[in-house]
Each structure stands twice: as structure tokens, then as C-alpha cells.
Regions:
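A short, conserved structural fragment
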Residues: 147-157
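Short amphipathic alpha-helical interaction segments
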Residues: 45-50, 132-147
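Short, amphipathic alpha-helical interaction segments positioned at domain boundaries
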Residues: 165-185
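Eukaryotic partner-binding/assembly regions in large regulatory complexes
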Residues: 1-89, 104, 116
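Short helix->loop/beta-hairpin flanking segments within DNA-binding domains
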Residues: 104-115, 180-183
Length: 185
């Protein structure tokens, strides 16, 4: 039997950011998460699912104790677009192994080509998650989150490309990002 997918709703990066800020300030609650979710979804079932996902992406995230310990560095990093992309991607990947597995697949293909198709990702992910019917739905939740975070682009429907940050264009970091992208994430 394959792994479980675990995510079935897209959560806006802005919502994750607000939830993390509330959690770091000590004012996060289940009701706060429900209020955030109600801004994105209608209906009690969808709001409850989203509330659970928001909690998992913020206060119940395995990275939260580390971020809480390094709160000042976190706030400084959130001011830089490239750092934000890595932070949000890390939060998603730490909370959901599906996100991590999708990122590994993307990284392997970005290592050798500039574009990756949705169908290619689905084919590779089905070897991990079997022919789970929730696989395409989960991918359509995770990929827009990566796009909104600023990690990847979608130049056309079903095609994804890496994001290059100008701050890295003339530094050795750009070489590392181009050649070892799948290791970094």
C-alpha cells in the first residue's frame, strides 16, 4: 500500500503567514484558524478541514519549535522574497510528506530540464502513492502554494519552471541552485 496524501485543500500563503505570526506572538487559537479559513472557504466542513491544515502548516508544524527559537531571524528572512519562498516551501514540506515528495520529483527533473509537466509529476508520484484518486487533487493544492510562495512558475497550464532570483544571478549560489536544486529543498 502507498503512502497517504494528507492534503486536500489549498491554503493561501498569506493565511499561512498570518497563522505563523499569530503562533509566534502567542495568540494563535483554533478559532483564529477558523476565522482565517472562513476567509478562504464557505461551509463548515471545508472550514474545519482548512482549519486543521492551517494548524498543521503553522503551530503544529515540526519546524515550529525551531522557528520559535529563532523568531527574530525568521522575521528578517520573511522580508526577502527568495527567503520567503524557501521558508514557506519548508513549512509545506515539513507538514506534508506529499509536498516533500512532489518537491523531490520537481528537483530531479529541474536538474536536467527547464520545464516539468503536471502529467510527468503525476506519473512519478503515482509510483509513491499508488493510483490514489486524491493524487491529482493534492497536486493541484500543493503546486499553487509553491507558485504563490515564489518557488516555481507556471508559464502555461500544466507546465512548471524554476524561479530565478536576481540576487543570486552573479553569485556561486546561483550555480548551486541550478545544479543541486533537488538537494536544497
Amino acid at each position: 500500500m502507498g503512502k497517504t496524501v494528507g492534503i486536500n485543500q489549498r491554503i493561501s500563503i498569506n493565511v499561512i503567514e498570518m497563522a505563523m505570526k499569530a503562533a509566534l506572538e502567542g495568540c494563535y487559537s483554533s478559532e483564529f484558524a477558523a476565522d482565517l479559513a472562513s476567509g478562504e472557504y464557505e461551509g463548515s466542513n471545508r472550514i474545519n478541514k482548512a482549519r486543521s491544515i492551517i494548524g498543521r502548516l503553522s503551530i503544529r508544524n515540526p519546524l515550529f519549535p525551531f522557528i520559535e527559537e529563532h523568531k527574530n531571524e525568521y522575521y528578517v528572512a520573511m522580508k526577502h522574497k527568495s527567503d520567503r519562498a524557501i521558508i514557506f516551501t519548508s513549512l509545506i514540506n515539513a507538514a506534508y510528506s506529499f509536498g516533500y515528495d512532489a518537491m523531490v520529483v520537481l528537483g530531479k527533473f529541474f536538474h536536467v530540464q527547464d520545464e516539468v509537466s503536471t502529467q510527468l509529476i503525476l506519473n512519478k508520484m503515482s509510483s509513491i502513492y499508488a493510483s490514489n484518486r486524491s493524487l491529482p487533487n493534492a497536486l493541484y493544492c500543493i503546486m499553487p502554494m509553491y507558485i504563490e510562495a515564489g518557488l516555481i512558475n507556471r508559464p502555461k497550464t500544466g507546465i512548471y519552471t524554476k524561479v530565478y532570483y536576481e540576487a543570486f544571478l552573479h553569485l556561486p549560489v546561483n550555480y548551486i541552485l541550478n545544479h543541486f536544486w533537488f538537494i536544497i529543498i
